[in-house]
């Protein structure tokens, strides 16, 4: 295929090993790569934007090697892609990639994910976009994940990937010869307990750490093929999960299933 102009971002920050591996994987295939990502870790920032302070950027080419132009940005992952598309890039990219994330982005957790939010910014601007994660916080071998991501991205681009469709890729944390297959998946609904750990500082004041533990993964009842496996079950079986996600969150159920709202209060007589 002809070389693509690719924008890469993440939420783990400019010094993360995952984003460097992804950038190198894309560059090795002859693509033109530019990186705009947070200047420090900003995981779980969701789709937050910086409105109360200016955004600052610094060149970071030396972290990625020859031929890759890179910036570290003071903002969130969504800020990074928005700024790149509006100001930093000379031309609209052919593809936006976000990752490789150090840890999973599965099920309803994607609403908190800076990785997915960065990719979603590309989707909202009608650029084919994919979020990429390795489903372990301890896994360090990102080279194979980069190869998988580029294989999928190139195939999707060649097959008329709808720009309004975000692809969320999760790769199991195991060696290449132990990965079984790739499947389209549905989002799980993830439930947590003990979401906050209460502590006391030396002055006797309370503070809290967010420390939730997953206790239940439910299959979504939402729109889509009912025979698809959930993304969580796919990863648990050492299979690659690829989930199509749209920015349209509109509910598609029956009108009769909605709460009955008496609108007489709007213009009371």
From Swiss-Prot:
Coiled coil: none annotated. The keyword Metal-binding applies. It holds the Pfam family SurE. Keywords: Cytoplasm, Hydrolase, Metal-binding, Nucleotide-binding. A divalent metal cation binds at residues 11-12, 43, 101. Binds 1 divalent metal cation per subunit. It catalyses: a ribonucleoside 5'-phosphate + H2O = a ribonucleoside + phosphate. GO terms for cellular component: cytoplasm. GO terms for molecular function: 3'-nucleotidase activity; 5'-nucleotidase activity; exopolyphosphatase activity; metal ion binding; nucleotide binding. The keyword Disulfide bond does not apply. Its EC number is 3.1.3.5. Its cofactor is a divalent metal cation. It is found in: Cytoplasm. PANTHER family: 5'-NUCLEOTIDASE SURE, 5'_3'-NUCLEOTIDASE SURE. Belongs to the SurE nucleotidase family. Nucleotidase that shows phosphatase activity on nucleoside 5'-monophosphates. This is 5'-nucleotidase SurE. It comes from Prochlorococcus marinus (strain MIT 9215). The gene is surE.
